[in-house]
UniProtKB/Swiss-Prot annotation:
It comes from Legionella pneumophila (strain Paris). Residues 94-96 are annotated as: Interaction with target base in tRNA. One of its GO terms (molecular function) is tRNA binding. The keyword tRNA processing applies. Its EC number is 2.8.1.13. It catalyses: S-sulfanyl-L-cysteinyl-[protein] + uridine(34) in tRNA + AH2 + ATP = 2-thiouridine(34) in tRNA + L-cysteinyl-[protein] + A + AMP + diphosphate + H(+). This is tRNA-specific 2-thiouridylase MnmA. InterPro entries: MnmA-like, MnmA-like_C, MnmA-like_central, MnmA-like_central_sf, Rossmann-like_a/b/a_fold. The keyword Zinc does not apply. Keywords: ATP-binding, Cytoplasm, Disulfide bond, Nucleotide-binding, RNA-binding, Transferase, tRNA processing, tRNA-binding. The lineage of its organism: Bacteria, Pseudomonadati, Pseudomonadota, Gammaproteobacteria, Legionellales. GO terms for cellular component: cytoplasm. Disulfide bonds join 99-195. Catalyzes the 2-thiolation of uridine at the wobble position (U34) of tRNA, leading to the formation of s(2)U34.
Length: 361
């Protein structure tokens, strides 16, 4: 009898096909739907009820059981509280990374093991290899959809208990499988944005949890150009929503956010998409979460991404200094954002990553 695998069923096409592929390979397959957010019952946040119905319909079609579990408290404590605290500091967090680390490959994994699973599986576009109790992470075949950026913080031990069934396929192939099988999710749109915000405007959502502190918008030369609604609403490189067009004695070039001074609550902007203040030669990151044995090989020349879907950028990682690493790039990088993550690669292997703490201009 093949191993028992519990698949995280999101109600989307990727996890639907992942479950089918595992069943085709002879595994004992069961599904599990996680509810991670409580406040979607009375408003327009994540359509959890619709997703659950789709997950149940797919499991019925595949003739596999579906478990449900509520991780809302774990999500609030381990992901959302961090999300809010980072925004309060004027930084731009990435909750998807923490959700994978704390919920999908921790709370879900432990719950599945308690249900008798040998492995969990998800619909992530990624690959892994397993050596004993350690798993190694690799890019998916579909480079456009590769999600290793969001998986870099998962523990190697958790990766050794994980199967990524769709890592060797492209998104169009997955859609075609689902269509041929007649799965109800075959034409369902991919989810985008931060899950707990749903269709709600980001500014409206944040205002429900954090008190906004308006302040001055200044040019890099120190001239006051207007007022911002609160530093938490802006990210480096942002162009839209600044409300400072048509200023006297300025060109028609668009304005971009180039810096945030938390101490003075000032938003700094500059004109032109190629303004030097938009670019950085490097960054300082926190402790690196390693997924491969490179910790003792620093300084290390490798590749990195500072945001999802960015082309890999050549860089050098310094040895740690008070748990911080200096990362210098071969060419200047645009709009590196503190609070986001830098993720390191060597060819197709994901080496790990860290939180971006500071920019080096």
């Amino acid at each position: 009898m093949k191993a028992k695998v519990i698949v995280g069923m999101s109600g989307g096409v990727d996890s639907s096909v992942a479950a089918w592929l595992l069943k085709e390979q002879g595994y004992q397959v069961e599904g599990l739907f996680m509810k991670n957010w409580e406040q979607d019952d009375h408003n327009d946040f994540c359509p959890a009820a619709k997703d659950l119905a789709d997950a149940q319909a797919v499991c019925n079609q595949l003739r596999i059981p579906l478990h449900t579990v509520n991780f809302s408290k774990e999500y609030w404590d381990r992901v959302f509280a961090y999300f809010l605290s980072e925004y309060e500091k004027g930084r731009t967090p990435n909750p998807d990374v923490l959700c994978n680390k704390e919920i999908k490959f921790n709370a879900f994994l432990n719950h599945a093991l308690n249900l008798g699973a040998d492995y969990i599986a998800t619909g992530h576009y990624a690959k892994n290899t397993i050596e004993g109790s350690i798993g190694y992470l690799f890019k998916a075949k579909d480079r456009e959809k590769d999600q290793t950026y969001f998986l870099h913080a998962v523990e190697p031990e958790a990766l050794s208990k994980t199967i990524f069934p769709i890592g060797d396929f492209t998104k169009p192939q997955i859609r075609e499988f689902a269509k041929q099988l007649g799965l109800v999710t075959h034409a369902k749109k991919d989810s985008t944005g931060i899950c707990f915000i749903g269709e709600k405007r980001f500014k409206t959502f944040l205002n429900e949890f954090i008190l906004a502190k308006p302040g001055e918008i200044k040019s890099t030369g120190g001239k006051t150009l207007g007022q911002h609604d609160g530093l938490m609403f802006y990210t480096l490189g942002q162009r839209q929503g600044l409300g400072i067009g048509g200023l006297q004695n300025s060109t028609d070039e668009p304005w971009y956010v180039v810096d945030k001074d938390i101490a003075s609550n000032t938003l700094y902007v500059a004109q032109g998409s190629q303004h030097p203040m938009l670019y950085s030669q490097g960054l300082i990151c926190g402790p690196i979460h390693w997924l491969a044995d490179y910790e003792n090989h620093l300084p290390l020349t490798c590749f990195a991404k500072t945001r999802y879907r960015q082309t890999d950028q050549a860089c050098m990682i310094s040895p740690p200094d008070n748990n911080l690493h200096y990362v210098i790039f071969s060419s200047p990088q645009r709009a590196i954002t503190p609070g986001q993550f830098i993720v390191f690669y060597e060819k197709n292997q994901c080496l790990g990553g860290a939180t971006i703490e500071q920019i080096i201009r």
